[in-house]
Structures are given as C-alpha cells and as structure tokens.
C-alpha cells in the first residue's frame, strides 16, 4: 500500500449496502448470479444478504430481461441462461431511466423497453362510454374492455378495484343540449315564411297587386 494509491477495500460506509441493494452502485453488471439466492425466500436465502457481490435476480425480472450477450451472439449458457434469448417487446420490462429522463445511456444496447408516452394516443372517451360516432376514423385509441355486468345492473361492490369496465356518464356540452323555442319565435318564423311565399308569387305573376 502506498500513500498515492491506498488500499481502501477494508473500509466501508454504512450506506453502501443500501446503495448496492437499491441502486446496484459499484457493482459489475457482468458479475455471476448468486447460487444461494432464492427468489421465493428473498434476501434471507443468501448468507451474504445485501453484501453479496453476485446478482440476486428478482422474480419480476426472471426471464424478462434480454440477454445482452445473446444480442451479440456471445452467450454460452443457451437454455440455462437466466435472461431472455429473444427480442420480444411484450415481455420486456419498461426502462425506468428512459421514462424519467427521455433518453438512455445504454441505448441502443439497453435490455429494457423504451416507451415514449408522448407519442401514445389518448383513449377515446366516447368509446369508453359505449359508443364513438367517429368509428374507425377516430383519431384516438379504442381500447376494448369487457363491461361489468353488476355495474350495468346498477351497482358493483368492487368499485374501482373491479377488473371490468365501468362506463361513466358524460355531461353533455352546451351545443348538444336540446333547445326549446318559445311559441313567439315559432309564430314569427311562420309569418316570415308566409311573406316570402307571397312575395315570390307576386314576382312570378301568380298574384296580381291592385
């Protein structure tokens, strides 16, 4: 050990295990998978716990993250690999870094799905209510949902936790409200139409003016 390059491996801060556990700081991404870790029992299954230098693959990411070695054609584990050996967007979890920042430092070799929420279409409110007058020409997204039979009858005890759709009543706008005209407006319009017909008859010579 020298003064210029001291050996600090025996020293550790109290917050380092937390950083390794929550954010995987100072960990080699190519480190091997821990053979003691069991996803069912969690961190207790590994004798080293959060201080383990190897990977603890969570069950939510099991066989969902694309193997970066497979992308390069260099993976030697074949079917024994704990990562996904296919580029299926439906199975890939969303990249949290890209969602928060709008870019990814690992692109184009990122193992997670990059979803641009700004480019996604909004759901059609009319369709969710039960009918969209625009039909296939609608510029918004039509998401097919199964209507809740209990809600259609009148009440669903599950409320917001129900897996089926609860269509909501939309308050009609001002232009869609039924307008009731008064009798005086109707009579005035009839008188105007009668005057117009009489004037046309005079012009055409059907009625003689004395």
UniProtKB/Swiss-Prot annotation:
It is found in: Nucleus. The keyword Zinc applies. GO terms for cellular component: nucleus. Its main location: nucleus. Keywords: Metal-binding, mRNA processing, Nucleus, Repeat, RNA-binding, Zinc, Zinc-finger. Pfam families: zf-CCCH (PF00642), zf-CCCH_2 (PF14608). One of its GO terms (molecular function) is zinc ion binding. InterPro entries: CPSF4/Yth1 (IPR045348), Znf_CCCH (IPR000571), Znf_CCCH_sf (IPR036855). This is mRNA 3'-end-processing protein YTH1.
């Amino acid at each position: 050990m020298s003064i210029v390059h001291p050996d600090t491996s025996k020293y550790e801060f109290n917050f380092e295990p937390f950083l390794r556990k929550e954010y995987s700081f100072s960990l080699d991404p190519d480190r091997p998978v821990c053979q003691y870790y069991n996803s069912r029992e969690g961190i207790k299954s590994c004798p080293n716990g959060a201080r383990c230098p190897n990977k603890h693959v969570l069950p939510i990411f099991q066989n969902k993250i694309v193997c970066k070695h497979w992308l390069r054609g260099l993976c030697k584990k074949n079917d024994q690999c704990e990562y996904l050996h296919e580029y299926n967007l439906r199975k890939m979890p969303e990249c949290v870094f890209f969602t928060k920042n709008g870019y990814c430092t690992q692109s184009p070799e990122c193992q997670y799905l990059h979803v641009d929420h700004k480019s996604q279409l909004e759901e059609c409110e009319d369709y969710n209510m039960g009918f969209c007058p625009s039909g296939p020409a609608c510029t918004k997204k039509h998401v097919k949902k199964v209507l809740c039979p209990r809600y259609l009858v009148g009440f669903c005890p599950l409320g917001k936790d129900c897996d089926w759709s609860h269509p909501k009543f939309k308050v009609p706008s001002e232009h869609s409200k039924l307008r009731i005209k008064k009798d005086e407006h109707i009579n005035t319009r009839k008188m105007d139409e009668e005057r117009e017909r009489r004037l046309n008859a005079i012009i055409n010579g059907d009625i003689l003016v004395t």
